[in-house]
Amino acid sequence: MKFAIALFDPPHSPAARRALRFSEAALAGGHEIVRLFFYQDGVHSASANVVSGQDEFDLPAAWRELVERNGLDAVVCIAAALRRGVLNAEEAERYGRPGANLGAPWELSGLGQLHEAAQSADRLVCFGGDR
């Protein structure tokens, strides 16, 4: 089965941890993830500036490792990211900000990428965003 995964909640939320575990289990079960899409507060999971407490699970590092190990397509919504200060080098320069906190393996792109992923996957599975 082909999955598209969308994460709407920040790294410290239960939904973010469930999204990671679901993704790991799907891959371990031989399924395909066509795209990971980070939207709303989920964009913080891609930020290099998130620091987890010493006794806490480092979810952003776990996402990065999963994406790199499996060669996954990991897209961060550009509009949501900009509003939350999650910038790659190009956007930091464009807006005159002192530094970027988003790099490989993440890609900034638009909401159309979520739509495209949903169309090419058998299932779109969303985590969080139920406030």
Curated annotation (Swiss-Prot):
Question: Transferase among the record's keywords?
Answer: yes
Q: Which residues form the active site?
A: C77 (cysteine persulfide intermediate)
The EC number(s) given in the record are 2.8.1.-
Disulfide connectivity for this sequence is none
Annotated InterPro entries: DsrEFH-like, Sulphur_relay_DsrE/F-like, Sulphur_relay_TusD/DsrE
Q: Which GO terms describe its biological process?
A: tRNA wobble position uridine thiolation
**Cellular component GO terms, alphabetically?**
cytosol; sulfurtransferase complex
Gene3D superfamilies from the xrefs? Answer: DsrEFH-like
Cite the Pfam families for this sequence. Answer: DsrE
Q: What class of enzyme is it?
A: transferase
Q: Which GO terms describe its molecular function?
A: sulfur carrier activity; sulfurtransferase activity
Location in the cell = Cytoplasm
Q: What does this protein do?
A: Could be part of a sulfur-relay system.
Of which family is this protein a member? Belongs to the DsrE/TusD family.
Return the protein name: Sulfurtransferase TusD homolog
Please tell me the species this chain comes from: Pseudomonas aeruginosa (strain ATCC 15692 / DSM 22644 / CIP 104116 / JCM 14847 / LMG 12228 / 1C / PRS 101 / PAO1)
Q: Which gene encodes it?
A: tusD
